[in-house]
Amino acid sequence: MSDAGVEEVDPSRWVEITRENPDHSSWYVERFRTMAAAGDDLDGESRFVDAMVARRARILDAGCGPGRVGSALARAGHEVVGVDVDPVLIAAAEQDHPGPRWLVGDLAELDLPARGITEGFDAIVCAGNVMPFLAPSTRVTVLERFRRHLRPGGRIAVGFGAGREYDFDEFLADAERAGLDAGVLLESWDLRPFTHASEFLVAILTP
């Protein structure tokens, strides 16, 4: 408990990494700027989510980083809010991708109505290996908070790779504990079917 009597959440692995290496966030930003300048295809996740929703949908980019996914969805005509725990990444998103609303915040404490964003979302996208970077103690809480921010009929798209100290079966069990059904499982953002040999998981979750 904090001095104010409010229970504190464990810091994410990303927070721990950036505490140990303060230059890590800037390196991450420049890495994706370089890839974008080289013409690399960075829009696989955004194409996937765009196909899930109607035009002018409300989309939450959860763990948005420097805004790669959310900005592409905004260019496609959607109303995007992006949240990330790292202020360096949010500053880069604001600089490189004006338009969406970019917010600093811990996903384990996600409460957008308290920040004046009262309308729910048609889709939540959590890409870029965000889930394995969470503190293990907060994973179910984060998924529960995602569920609470959905509009009726809304869906959550989560993607992350194997070998990151978060087994796919464990994630699916956490989703169930959070009141979510993983009705669609894929091994990539380009709709390849998931198998037990898959090294990547894309899960579509619904309440």
Where are these regions (language model features)?
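Class I SAM-dependent methyltransferase SAM/SAH-binding core
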Residues: 66-111
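Conserved class I S-adenosyl-L-methionine
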Residues: 2-65
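A short glycine-rich, Lys/Arg-flanked "PGG" loop and its adjoining helix->strand segment in the class I
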Residues: 140-152
